[in-house]
Amino acid sequence: MQRWRVGDVTITRIIETEDASMSAAIMLPDATPANLAAIGWLKPHFVTDAGQLISSVHSLLVESCGQRIVIDTCLGNDKTRIVPQWNRRQGRFLDEIAAAGFARERVDFVVCTHLHPDHVGWNTMLVDGRWLPTFPSARYIFSAQDWAWLDQAPVSALGDFAGDSVRPVFDSGQGECVAPDFRITDEVWLESTPGHSPGHVSIRIASRGEQAVVTGDLMHHPCQLARPHW
């Protein structure tokens, strides 16, 4: 568990998966072992000794102005997915966020930077054969543009993540489609960063003269800080 402070805001990172299974050939074809070797600071945290990318699926838990905010909800348990590492998982995510002070019943906001299966999975959980919102007291915040896109899209080859992880939230009355400048607290707000998806947003955090940005999938790996054109 990693934790940072940005002024009065606390940010905690909860990792669901972290490994070298990400295919550079698909996601970042220029990130070859030879090219990565030239970026020395990537080892040992972001690249293996063999030159493979280390990537993670994680949530960020944000405490601001008395509000508990979960940013991106990872993969989830019990979800049918074509990617083997994502399929029918049985992880301890809820135990880990509870240990960080974010018991699911006490979360105030859930924010998805975009609507892809590795960012929406724990929006819901399987209860007696039904997908129900994991966070029963939370307002779920979605980019209106991203939901308009996903709502009309055919079921993805990756799995029906709209059906099992997003629509049940709207069915419960907890889902809200918002503009890309929506403000969650005085210290935390959305900013439009489309491209990876039509309505992708980043989350800006500013408090007491300090700032941070949660970029979602604006970038896929730290190597892109050194090589943005990848």
Which residues fall in each region the model found?
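Short, P/G- and charge-enriched loop/turn segments at secondary-structure junctions
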Residues: 45-50, 128-129, 190-191
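Metallo-beta-lactamase
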Residues: 1-102, 106-118, 125, 134-192, 210-216
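Metal-dependent phosphodiesterase/nuclease catalytic metal-binding core
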Residues: 61, 191, 201-223, 228
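Metal-dependent catalytic neighborhoods of phosphoester/phosphodiester hydrolases
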Residues: 82-84, 120-130
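Active-site glycine- and acidic-residue-rich loops that bind
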Residues: 120-122, 189-201
